[in-house]
């Protein structure tokens, strides 16, 4: 084709577009506000305690953004239990009875859009007693020893609960076919627990949770539309890549022949649990795209803590990390003490993943948890969800931080991923029981948390 024609084509196209638009302005329709949600979605506060709410908007084009509290009107279903200020701070009444509840909602002043029930915050008044209680450790250990959810089906495993200063209680259950137990120093493939590590890396790279861009948010809570990699726990980016890095992996194709780097318009704005979101984000918005696999873990670890060691078996950002429970716990401790900016990103910009009124495309977790920045929010009321933040992996590695951002926990194991993400979910079913036993000081004897 004639070069002059090729070079003049953009100018001709611009002229035609200008003519069709009347010579000025734009015919693009601005996205409209479709829904707003509050986070944390579950509040467990003692009488007199307060908590700041965050308002997240979802627009018609699938994009999300944090809204300033000044643009919203907040309300409480029971002001005798809890009030909410104009700036979105919830405060429990000093004389509120333990067990009382209230629903906190918000209305966008400009559009009139109001939080649906799933987007509102559910508050329960709890005791102000210190945790751990005198029986927290014994209750956690008894739950591990006696509850079927923590039994032989998920052994061997290591478990731990701690705070920002280190472990408070831990143990190792069972052994593998060689007689070896899982220890705090055992290096494991953590699969999708890599997602929380990457989200923590990105938030630290930006400098704060508030500095996360709308693009960061859409990629990290899996609504970007980059859903063509799948979430296989087997090798996705083979070692035959040259160079062996994220960018090269994205040039591969899925079984349907679609590039990993391709966006699917059908999933833009919809939650779709897929490795493609983080892989493409790392390539487009961070320096990790050209980092070879042998240096990938070191590069991420350097921003998280000088004390930890992370390795990657393949350049799969969302699922390829190997590390010990000891090193993963260090990251969780630094989140809790605020050294890592991820503390303020926990639970923000949550999207729904299940339900009749949820426009999600795919979730591997059978409960309607919400998904935030590289982690789940365990807020299903049918299983007495406590709002903990977690990132279970397909092999069974389950890290969590409780809703109050005071304690962390790990249940570490590595089993073959024949059931997709279900080893991670099985670990979560045990891990949440241990957490609840520790938080309440009461042994958990049922399949879901009670008491």
What is each stretch, according to the model?
Residues 140-183, 398-402, 406-412:
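A short, well-structured edge-of-sheet supersecondary motif
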Residues 22-129:
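Extracytoplasmic soluble-region selector
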Residues 18-20:
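C-terminal motif of bacterial Sec signal peptides marking the signal peptidase cleavage site
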Residues 128-138, 385-451:
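Structured C-terminal helix/loop/strand segments within mature extracytoplasmic catalytic/sensor domains
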Residues 234-332:
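Mid-domain, small-residue-enriched loop/turn segments at the edges of structured enzyme/sensor domains
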